[in-house]
A protein has these predicted regions:
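Histidine/acidic-rich helix-loop-helix segments that form or flank divalent-metal centers
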Residues: 167, 219, 223, 450-474, ...
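Amphipathic alpha-helical repeat scaffolds of TPR domains
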Residues: 7-89, 114-135, 163-186, 212-246, ...
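Acidic/His-rich, divalent-metal-binding segments that scaffold phosphate/diphosphate chemistry
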Residues: 372-501
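Solenoid-like repeat scaffolds
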Residues: 66-70, 107-114, 156-165, 201-208, ...
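Divalent metal-dependent phosphate-bond-processing catalytic cores, especially two-metal-ion Mg2+/Mn2+ enzymes
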Residues: 163, 201-213, 236-241, 245, ...
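Helix-turn-helix repeat elements of alpha-solenoid scaffolds
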Residues: 10-19, 33-62, 86-108, 136-157, ...
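Short amphipathic alpha-helical segments
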Residues: 425-433, 511, 524, 528
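Non-transmembrane, amphipathic alpha-helical segments
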Residues: 136, 298-301, 322-326, 350-354, ...
Length: 562
């Protein structure tokens, strides 16, 4: 293959990805039934024809790249590297394909002296592994950390390195090590603090000073990320990461004391501007969390400040995205503020009825944001992860009156946003209710002993309860797919082995999600078991025995319907 063929392949592929985004966006536009169905048919037809086209294209292109010695000249290899970085920087990209490209280039450049090319490869591998680690923690989290660390140690020779792209990569690696990798747990607080000290050394070095005029973006980014860790270190140390996978980080008392001192000094010197900026929401929420944890302010005081700020700035929020091309900041604004508001709301002393009223208000804010969100910004995976944190924040469940309200909340946030997942869950639910209705009418003895029913007459007496349980279980059976929907809904090309491995983790992921609340925990076994064989001797996950579950009957029903 020559460089022009490679360039054209990836240019065509980007066109396909853009079209996929447009079709997905069309499914979210409010319209009448006929218009919506027409959009659904157009989407299905595109995937049907494009899958065949891309499958043929992939089979003609990828095997050549995957050979031990691909038949590519220097220009072709250079174009492959350029295409990889174009994908890396694009709003729309394909993580699995990006990872495959990086692996191919890694074999080619691995033993060369081309530092810029190899750093591009390492940066891409770090990024793709980091994103996959948000779905399946290991082995991707450790790989991401190791690739970022490999890049960051290049800072020791910062002055001798002439390539601007390598300088940029060093700063990006540092930022992800002290923030993303720390949040995900692959970097300890002690390690993050030591890496931050390295960042400050680089920030004050003559080597960086010499590049501040010629490469202003490098110094500016390092300044931003060094300061960001200063504001977020306390929250990281206190494990404010409240997803269902949050884990206790042991931080030595002397380090915790040092972090608290640095944070207090920072906020004492901070001069907040009168006009709220796009960055102020991070500062305000972080300071409130710090003040509350250290006894400086009450939950009521912190909630009031964030609530007032949010109401004042919300009308201007879209300007943040217009000013900053990283429209991802709009997601961060909404999710950071709403997460903090709900967190403090639970802890306030206000009457429960008032808490529930504000919580309903915040739920509507979330729904309005999702409805207005421009899917063409290319950050839907980031939005999925943010919504996941809000949907599965355990303390919030104290503000619901019924189990049905909890299920509706989850369904709206992490299922109904995605058309195929939404339709699939509804169809499984309809099938399950139909099958169970027939069983109750014709063979009720099959259900004797299930959920404590003692006779066919008892089955009939509990008909409504059984059907409601099946309905809810079906709606939630695939909830573990939320963070991997971009993979699952990849219908324009064959999936890679990497992607299949990630998809197979969704039953356990769903079980983790549903374990956060007593009402939701009733559905854990169904989420975990719906891909197991009836006899328990096949399917996945391997660490779950569906034959020993008290929900075995319902697991089998949902499996058939699925």
């Amino acid at each position: 293959m020559n460089s022009e063929q490679i360039r054209k392949f990836f240019a065509d592929y980007q066109v396909v990805l853009k079209r996929v985004e447009q079709l997905e966006a069309a499914m979210r536009i409010k319209s009448d039934w006929d218009t919506w169905c027409a959009a659904l048919r157009e989407r299905a037809e595109f995937f049907r024809t494009e899958y065949a086209h891309m499958n043929a294209l992939m089979r003609s292109v990828m095997p050549e790249f995957a050979k031990d010695e691909p038949d590519l000249d220097d220009d072709a290899w250079k174009q492959l590297q350029i295409s990889m970085m174009d994908f890396y920087r694009a709003d729309t990209h394909d993580l699995a394909l990006l990872m495959e490209l990086a692996k191919i280039l890694q074999k080619h450049y691995g033993h060369s002296n081309n530092l810029a090319a190899m750093t591009d490869v390492d940066l891409t591998l770090a990024y793709t592994n980091l994103e996959f680690s948000r779905i399946l923690r290991e082995p991707y989290g450790t790989r991401a950390r190791d690739y970022y660390r490999k890049i960051s140690v290049l800072s020791r020779n910062f002055g001798a390195i002439k390539e601007h792209s390598v300088h940029q990569a060093i700063v990006v690696a540092y930022a992800n090590l002290v923030m993303s990798c720390c949040v995900l747990g692959t970097v300890t607080m002690e390690e993050a603090f030591a890496i931050w000290e390295e960042m400050k050394e680089l920030q004050a070095s003559d080597a960086l000073a010499a590049t501040r005029e010629s490469e202003p973006d490098v110094g500016r980014l390092l300044d931003i990320f060094t300061e960001r860790f200063r504001t977020d270190a306390y929250a990281l140390a206190k494990s404010f990461d409240r997803t269902m996978e949050a884990h206790t980080r042991f931080v030595p008392p002397e380090l915790m004391s040092r972090i608290e001192q640095i944070t207090a000094e920072y906020y004492e010197k901070l001069d907040k501007p009168e006009e709220s900026t796009a960055d102020m929401f991070q500062i305000i929420t972080s300071q409130c969390e710090f003040d509350y944890e250290t006894g400086r302010r009450t939950a009521d005081e912190c909630w009031k400040e964030i609530h007032t700020f949010f109401r004042k700035t919300k009308p201007k929020v879209k300007q943040f995205g217009e000013v900053d091309v990283r429209k991802i900041d709009v997601i961060s604004y909404y999710m950071t503020c709403l997460d903090a508001l709900i967190s403090f709301l639970v802890e306030t002393t206000m009457p429960m009825e008032d808490k529930k009223r504000y919580f309903r208000e915040y739920q509507q804010d979330i729904r309005n944001f999702i409805a207005d969100y421009d899917t063409r910004t290319g950050h839907s995976n980031t939005l999925n992860n943010a919504l996941e944190e809000l949907a599965f924040f355990p303390n919030a469940y104290a503000l619901f009156d019924t189990a049905e309200e909890k299920i509706d909340y989850i369904f709206r946030l992490v299922v109904a946003r995605h058309c195929t997942a939404f339709l699939h869950s509804l169809m499984v639910s309809a099938f399950a209710e139909a099958i169970l209705s027939a069983i109750i009418d014709k063979e009720p003895t099959l259900m004797v002993g299930y959920h404590g029913v003692t006779s066919p007459e008892d089955v009939q007496a509990h008909r409504a309860e059984i059907l409601q349980f099946a309905h809810d279980a079906a709606l939630l059976h695939d909830v573990g797919k939320n963070s991997m929907l971009e993979i699952i809904e990849t219908q324009h090309r064959p999936l890679t082995d990497e992607e299949f491995g990630i998809i197979r983790s969704h039953p356990n992921r769903g079980g983790q999600y549903l374990s956060i609340d007593e009402d939701l925990a009733r559905y854990v076994d169904i989420a975990r078991g719906h891909h197991k064989f009836y006899n328990g001797k096949g399917g996945y996950p391997n660490d779950f025995d569906n034959t020993a579950s008290p929900e075995r009957f319902m697991i089998d029903i949902i499996t058939v319907c699925d």
